C-alpha cells in the first residue's frame, strides 16, 4: 500500500468569531446568522459559549472560537489556531 499526499481543495466558507460578550452587536449578528441556518439547533450559554447541534452531536464553541458554515451548509466550531492555519479571508459574504 502506498502512502499518498493530499492537498485540501480550495473551498470558500462562511465563518464568524464567537464574541467575548453577549448583548453586543457582534453577538447579535452571530445569533441572527445561526438562527437562519440552524433554527432551534443552537443554544447560547451564560458563559458566552455557543452549543451547536451537528451531524456528530452537540459541539461547543467558546468565546474566541470560530463557527464555520461548510460548503454543504453544516455549521461547526473551530479553534482559532486551526482556523487561521486552514483559512484566509477572501471577502465579505
Where on the chain are the PLM-derived regions?
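Short, compact, well-ordered microdomains
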Residues: 54-93
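N-terminal domain-onset segments
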Residues: 1-55
Amino acid at each position: 500500500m502506498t502512502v499518498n499526499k493530499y492537498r485540501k481543495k480550495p473551498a470558500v466558507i462562511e465563518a464568524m468569531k464567537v464574541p467575548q460578550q453577549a448583548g453586543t452587536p457582534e453577538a447579535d449578528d452571530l445569533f441572527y446568522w445561526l438562527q437562519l441556518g440552524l433554527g432551534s439547533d443552537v443554544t447560547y450559554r451564560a458563559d458566552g459559549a455557543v452549543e451547536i447541534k451537528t451531524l456528530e452531536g452537540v459541539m461547543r464553541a467558546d468565546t474566541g472560537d470560530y463557527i464555520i458554515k461548510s460548503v454543504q451548509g453544516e455549521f461547526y466550531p473551530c479553534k482559532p489556531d486551526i482556523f487561521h492555519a486552514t483559512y484566509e479571508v477572501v471577502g465579505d459574504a
